[in-house]
């Protein structure tokens, strides 16, 4: 697992990519305009369905992370260790073969894991990336209010914060630029893994 335990005033923006609802291009545009690099955790179906967006992520200096093949809704612990390994290695092989990117970060679907899962990732030369901030942004049919979402994000700002945002969220696409500006106004910067 990766814990950023320093006191530098930097934060990490991460986006989970399981489905595309037309918001990722706007997010990439904002990141480019603001000069911020982020980590995008992609599933294999997402990469297959959106190769131009994945290529753009890489070309614009973002880090790709592995988010499994099928994004099991019951979490990785619901699978046998062999199936968990397949979730990691199959997506890794697909991204490596089709995009030339050698991913080394993994985010557990739903955040669920067990000790054996961590050992498996270590054996696959992966680091687990969790988060210190997440909110209910993933339901495209029930998007949170822009102003309150931005305030929640600002309220959780702290050195080493890892923000988990879902790229299918219209709210995240709408407030990202303002959030980046607020982070910088508070004296913080952005890092990537």
Where are these regions (language model features)?
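Active-site-proximal beta-strand/loop segments in catalytic clefts of secreted hydrolases
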Residues: 15-18, 41-45, 68-69, 107-111, ...
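Active-site beta->alpha N-cap acidic-glycine motif
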Residues: 1-76, 81-97, 101-103, 178, ...
């Amino acid at each position: 697992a990766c814990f950023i335990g320093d006191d530098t005033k930097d934060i990490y923006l991460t986006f989970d990519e399981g489905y595309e609802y037309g918001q990722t291009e706007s997010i990439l545009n904002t990141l480019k305009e603001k000069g911020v690099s982020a980590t995008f955790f992609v599933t294999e179906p997402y990469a297959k369905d959106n190769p131009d967006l994945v290529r753009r992520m890489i070309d614009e200096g973002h880090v790709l992370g592995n988010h499994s093949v099928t994004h099991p809704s019951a979490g990785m612990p619901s699978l046998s260790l062999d199936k968990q390994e397949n979730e990691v290695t199959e997506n890794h092989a697909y991204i490596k073969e089709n995009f030339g990117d050698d991913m080394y970060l993994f985010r557990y679907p739903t955040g669920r894991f067990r000790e054996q899962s961590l050992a498996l990732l270590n054996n696959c030369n992966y680091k687990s990336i969790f988060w210190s901030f997440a909110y209910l942004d993933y339901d495209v049919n029930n998007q949170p209010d822009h102003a309150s979402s931005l305030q929640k994000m600002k309220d959780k700002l702290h050195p080493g914060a890892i923000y988990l945002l879902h790229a299918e969220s219209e709210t995240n696409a709408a407030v990202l630029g303002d959030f980046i500006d607020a982070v910088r106004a508070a004296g913080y910067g952005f890092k990537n893994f």
